[in-house]
Every structure is written in structure tokens, then in C-alpha cells.
């Protein structure tokens, strides 16, 4: 089997899990959003952002930047994965807590990948993210909108020092 076929099959397995899930409690909600994060970052199915973010969702980052709307959030994910095309996230912990008619979903994961492309971070450096240092924490508020659970607000904190180190050009 070709590598592309294997990667496609792996992605479709994750997609099938997502599509067949019954979302009934904290555990299933947490798993649903974990799988979507895997589709977006590990399989580069960036369009999945539109499946899990409300049209008017707001993503706030550690540096104070705010991305308003699913399209802006998709563009941010695309820019990040462009810099690290082999990016993989490793979910270390995740859970959800019901609060009224919403859930709060927490995720803690690490990232690995190599800065292989020209991007918003500058030219490719071929330096790797160090997963033991490249930690991400995220808290999202999800709500059922037109029958689908969607993120309406999210706060995500990347380890920017780790990302900057991987993107820093070599000393001349």
C-alpha cells in the first residue's frame, strides 16, 4: 500500500469515528472534540474547522490575538500547519464539564513537527518543535447549535518560545 493511501485510510477511520459518535455526556463530548483536533492537525483536514466552530466563534490566543469567525480560525490553523506540514499533536489529557446547556472542554497536548516551509514565521529552518517543550493548553465553550455541538469561545495557549526557537534562522 502506498503511504498516501495509508494516510488517507487513517484519516477516514478518524472521520468515521467522529460521524458515528453519539454525544450524550462529558466523556463523549470530550472525545468528539479530541478526534476533530486530530483530524485538523494530524491529518491536515483543515476544513474540519467549519464542522466544530460556530460561524461567529471567537478564538483567543496567549498573546492577546483574537480570531473572530470560523473562517478566521481556519486561516490561523492553515498558517500554522503551513509552517509545520508534518505537525502532529499528542493529546495528553482532555475532559469536558457540563455547565447548563453548554460544556467546557479542556485539552492539554504537545506538538511535534519540523519548520519546513516559508510561512508567517519566516523562511524554513528545518528545525523541529520539541514535544517535551511545545505544550498547548486549551479551554473551549461548546454549545448545541442547530443540532450540532460547536465551539463558541476558545482560549488556546501555545508555548510560543518553543515555536519561535524552531522558526529562528540559523546564526550567520
Residue ranges and their predicted role:
Residues 109-147:
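Exposed beta-sheet edge and beta->alpha loop/turn motif
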Residues 30, 34, 46-108, 113-117:
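A solvent-exposed, acidic/Ser-Thr-rich amphipathic alpha-helical stretch
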Residues 40-41, 109, 155:
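Tryptophan-centric aromatic hotspots in well-structured domains and transmembrane helices
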Residues 77, 91-96, 135-143, 155-156:
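Hydrophobic/aromatic beta-strand elements that line small-molecule binding cavities or substrate pockets
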Amino acid at each position: 500500500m502506498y503511504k498516501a493511501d495509508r494516510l488517507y485510510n487513517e484519516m477516514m477511520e478518524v472521520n468515521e469515528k467522529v460521524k458515528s459518535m453519539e454525544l450524550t455526556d462529558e466523556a463523549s463530548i470530550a472525545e468528539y472534540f479530541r478526534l476533530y483536533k486530530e483530524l485538523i492537525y494530524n491529518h491536515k483536514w483543515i476544513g474540519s474547522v467549519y464542522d466544530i466552530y460556530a460561524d461567529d466563534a471567537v478564538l483567543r490566543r496567549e498573546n492577546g490575538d483574537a480570531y473572530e469567525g470560523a473562517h478566521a480560525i481556519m486561516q490561523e490553523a492553515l498558517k500554522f500547519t503551513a509552517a509545520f506540514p508534518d505537525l502532529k499533536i499528542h493529546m495528553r489529557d482532555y475532559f469536558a464539564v457540563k455547565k447548563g446547556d453548554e460544556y467546557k472542554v479542556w485539552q492539554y497536548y504537545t506538538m511535534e513537527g519540523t519548520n519546513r516551509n516559508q510561512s508567517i514565521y519566516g523562511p524554513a529552518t528545518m528545525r523541529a518543535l520539541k514535544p517535551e517543550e511545545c505544550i498547548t493548553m486549551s479551554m473551549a465553550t461548546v454549545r448545541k447549535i442547530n443540532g450540532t455541538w460547536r465551539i463558541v469561545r476558545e482560549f488556546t495557549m501555545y508555548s510560543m518560545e518553543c515555536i519561535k526557537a524552531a522558526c529562528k534562522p540559523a546564526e550567520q
